[in-house]
Amino acid sequence: MRLGILLVLAMFLVSTACAEDLGNPVTGEAKTAFLTAWGERLRGMRSLHMVFTQEKHLRLLRQALVAQGELWLKGETLLYVLTNTAGEKELTVRLDKQTVKTYYPLLNTLEVIDLQTTRTLPQSLAFWQADPEALARDYEVDLFQAAGLHTLHLVPKDAKVPLQEMRIVLRDFHPQELVQIEKSGTRILMHITTFTINPEISEAQLDLHVPAGTKVTHPLK
């Protein structure tokens, strides 16, 4: 489970781009070499700190919902926080080998997903794979290059998942944008401003603090 992280994210432009909008296609040995090199970078990642701005576009709203995000990853434990424009924490997600816990402070609710039972990560958390073969197993993968940027275009092979497509824009293997488009029409765009590999992260930084009296739900049970 190489944190499929990130992000829980997810992320994406106001309209689905055609292949020609993403740059020149990279195929064959060049594509394999890029994916292999990216996998090697991920295998060497022991920890990660990321700061980003997220725009969430919903069909029923004219304006995007904007939030600031911060993510910490150490080993196989991840903590992800979103704060709205009023400075209020909207959600905190903690993921480890056993569970995904999502705390909504404004709703006084904690959602718990038992990974030992479901045996799979949510789609939005499982897109980063250290193994290119694993990536190709779960997604149709296309790679494009333009102006020093590489864009991975991912389409889930499982037609039952809510995700329609995902795009990851990288410069020198560092993500610049993450884009997710769901079949419901929801689009999320994540602009990454800080992406630091292997920083020092303490166990305390990965704690999820939930007040007593918080409502606990298990949405997949």
Regions found by a protein language model. Name each.
Residues 1-4:
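Positively charged n-region of N-terminal signal peptides that target proteins for export
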Residues 46-48, 67-69, 76, 89-91, ...:
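Envelope-exposed proteins and targeting segments
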Residues 125-130, 137-138:
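Anionic-ligand binding region
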Residues 70-123, 188:
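An acidic-aromatic
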Residues 111-113, 134-220:
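Gly/Pro-enriched, hydrophobic low-complexity segments
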Residues 18-64, 210-221:
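N-terminal leader/targeting segments and the immediate start of mature chains
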Residues 6-14:
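Bacterial N-terminal signal peptides
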Residues 38, 50, 80-81, 100, ...:
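Buried hydrophobic packing residues in well-ordered domains
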